[in-house]
Structures are given as structure tokens and as C-alpha cells.
Amino acid sequence: MKTVTLFSDGSCLNNPGAGGWAYILEFNGAVKKDSGGAAMTTNNQMELTAVIEGLKALKEPCEVRLFTDSSYVANAVNSWLDGWVKKNFIGSDKKPVKNIELWQEYLRVSRPHKVTASWIKAHNGHPQNEECDTMAREKATKFQNEADI
């Protein structure tokens, strides 16, 4: 199984509001980047969408080392998600987990892979995280500008 590195970030203006997501995949010197967005979303939805889109770009099962500045995504991937599934997406507060549809899609696209997430501090000089942040903010701004027309 190949080991790939996935960097991801999401951005949301006004939260909720226009948002953007971005990822960078790296494998043996090869790099793939993509980004997108939505007119009305949240920061957590964009953070999670970035990971989903990055996983969808993989052509075969991989060991995925995910680096994200979202503690929400990192904690869910590494520990919360199993409990949510067992409890039919009811959280520890006895309320439905937010973004259920996106988490279900994450489960579907991550199934062939072995994903481990690491949290990295945002805006701390990590080159790939900074690039993802820039790409995601550009998409969020684009969607906000289109909504203003």
C-alpha cells in the first residue's frame, strides 16, 4: 500500500457564508492540488470537504497521512467517528452530530484507505498548509464576490 500525504484546509467568510476548500496530495515527489467552494457553508463543512475531495482523488487504496489545522477533523478521524457510527451519529451531548451527510461521505471515500490525521497549527509557516489556506480563501472570496453580483 502506497503512503501519500494529504494536506487540507477550509475557509469560510462570516461562518456561515461563502467558503472554500483546498487540498494538496504528495507522493514520491508528485503533487496534485485542487480547490473549490460553496456560496453558503460553514468552516467545518469546508474543512471536511477538503479531506473528502483529496481522498476521492486517490486512484488506489493508500495509507494516507492527513495534515489539517482543523482539530474538529483530526479528532473526528482519529477518535470520535467510531463512536458516532456506533451511536447512529448521536454525539456525547445526546444530539445528532453536525454534518452527518459529509461524515457519511467521508466514511465511504475513506473505506479503501488507512487514514491517520495529525493536527497542525494554522498560520504557523507550514508551507503546504499555508498554500491550502491561500487556495481555500481565494475560492471563498470568489464565491462571495459572485453572490454579491
Curated annotation (Swiss-Prot):
SUPFAM superfamilies: Ribonuclease H-like
EC number: 3.1.26.4
Binding site for Mg(2+) 2: D9, D133
Record keyword tRNA processing present: no
Cell membrane listed as a keyword: no
Domain RNase H type-1 residue range list: 1-141
GO CC field: cytoplasm
MF terms in GO: magnesium ion binding; nucleic acid binding; RNA-DNA hybrid ribonuclease activity
Compartment(s) where it occurs, according to its Swiss-Prot or TrEMBL record: Cytoplasm
Cofactors, names only: Mg(2+)
CDD domains noted in UniProt: RNase_HI_prokaryote_like
Pfam families: RNase_H (PF00075)
InterPro entries: RNase_H, RNaseH-like_sf, RNaseH_domain, RNaseH_sf, RNaseHI
Origin superkingdom: Bacteria
Keywords: Cytoplasm, Endonuclease, Hydrolase, Magnesium, Metal-binding, Nuclease
Catalysed conversion reaction: Endonucleolytic cleavage to 5'-phosphomonoester
Positions with a binding annotation for Mg(2+) 1: D9, E47, D69
Predominant place of localization: cytoplasm
A GO BP entry: DNA replication, removal of RNA primer
Family per similarity comment: Belongs to the RNase H family.
Subunit field text: Monomer.
Function: Endonuclease that specifically degrades the RNA of RNA-DNA hybrids.
PANTHER family: RIBONUCLEASE H1
Protein's UniProt name: Ribonuclease H
Source organism per UniProt: Campylobacter curvus (strain 525.92)
